[in-house]
Amino acid sequence: MVFATGRMSFKKVLNAYIKNWQEAKKKLPADYKISLNLFVAYDTDYLKTQSTDYTNLSQDIVDQFDQIVFLGAKNALRSIERLEEYSKLDKKELRSIFAAGYAGKRNAILFAALENHMDYLLFLDDDEYPLAVTKSKEVCLWSGQHIILSHLMEIPNADYTNGLHCGYISPIPQIPFNEDFTEDDLRVFIEAISNDILNWDN
């Protein structure tokens, strides 16, 4: 479960997803084994917050996860240093990948997930609750949606799942093509993550 955020209110959304997860577990087969992990990449500059606004979670939330990884600006710098050792990208290119803002935070999470050997990631919007409103006659009803369960059941058979609660697709940083990273490499990547917003044709 992943959040790229700069809003303190993400903790309220996270709490709603914990309740969503507790309901989802009831619908899973008894022998379905899942290790649930939380990755939070936070931006303290976005709304002038501090790291503890994101890292100070209630024990009830902490107990739901097998592992929690927080990623702030210092983590991005350490990622750049580690990648510099064995990457063919230079420091400027690496800084563009882990830049401030939404895309840089998502990229930091992707790298941390690789380092932590995650099988799947579910990016969730930090300002959308797992709810939907429907109109029934003259009344509007708020109903829970099975966001986590839906993705969990589909992702083992897919390269990528996406939905209305998953946030925007990360902008891809500008990296010049060379013999190590060709236009065809980028095309394969784009096709793997393509959807109605981002695909090879547009």
Protein language model features and the residues they cover:
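Short alpha-helical segments and helix-capping/turn motifs at coil-helix boundaries
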Residues: 15-26, 105-110, 142-151
